[in-house]
Amino acid sequence: MKIIAGVDEAGRGALAGPVVASAVILPEEYDLDGLNDSKKVSPPKREVLFDKITSQAISIGVGIVPAIEIDRINILESTYKAMKMSLGKLNPVPEEALIDGFPLNTQIIPNRGIIKGDETIDVIKAASIIAKVTRDRIMVKYDQQYPLYLSLI
């Protein structure tokens, strides 16, 4: 079996908070009924899928770039940085990464960009769910520290 990772991000279009990327390697067989792009799944269903993905995935990596760094290097570079960070946390190292959108400029892992990959490829859908739930949990913590923070997103 070729080891393939799916990669996606959450928070790129948001007004506040970090950008979070996730890389996921799924086994050949998995049971992720209802898996879809995180934007098309309700928050409660995302939480259920998050638990299923984390219990079934071979490996999951998450990269987080905080807002202060986004302001310094821009959102596009921050997104790429978070994606590279997430790939660097995978064990085993994938033979190829499928990136939602455009490919990463990196020689570390061969990769392909797939437009709308979060709508068509399960391993990217899984990465989408992990990134979105992780970011949402961060934003809830921010809102607890700074009331009304969630109203900014």
Residue ranges and their predicted role:
Residues 1-153:
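RNase H-like, Mg2+-dependent phosphodiesterase core
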